[in-house]
Amino acid sequence: MSVYEERIYTMLTSSEDKFKSAYEISNHLNMVKRKLIVTFWKNVEKELNILVNERDQNFKVVLDSDIFYANSGCSLFLEDNTKAGFIYEHLSGDQCMGLWFENPKFDISKIDSYRIEQQNKITNYSTYGWWISYENTNENFNNFDSLLMILPDKSMEYAKIKAQNLFELAVENKEHLRYLINNCLK
């Protein structure tokens, strides 16, 4: 054990009450973490809906029902299309954001041609798989520092920032999404 681990061990085993408290906390920590994450993404969804209602009602906000699914997302779709949109993906893990399309529903050769033609005009341009625009947000809700950002006293403000970031990406690149929908769907 490291010196730090030895101190933790000594502190937690110094009395039955301390050990019991640590044990109770460790048994409930995952539930607390899950609630923090769910509450945060529901706040992002709420903030996105506010932005859509105030600024561009052509977008539709969709938050996956299972935030802990590996490819879970919080998306901005254009009108009723749900085959391509602006998305935060991996909501409970290593998050990314960008302009995404559902691969089997699109003509990839048309998308590849469009990517090459528009690469200097697309924010965070990408040729990565099902992404036209891609950015790793460097946030992972399996990490302590990222979880600190969504504690109740910070969650609403941070949700506004996350919503604003996705909304701005969507507004800046709306023409590219519209092109995909109108020209590349199979």
At which residue positions do the language-model features occur?
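C-terminal amphipathic "assembly/sorting" segment characterized by alternating charged
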Residues: E117-K186
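Contiguous mid-protein beta-loop-alpha structural module that forms a pocket-lining wall or clamp
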Residues: M1-M11
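Short, solvent-exposed helix-helix connector turns and helix-capping sites enriched
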Residues: Y4, S15-F19, L151
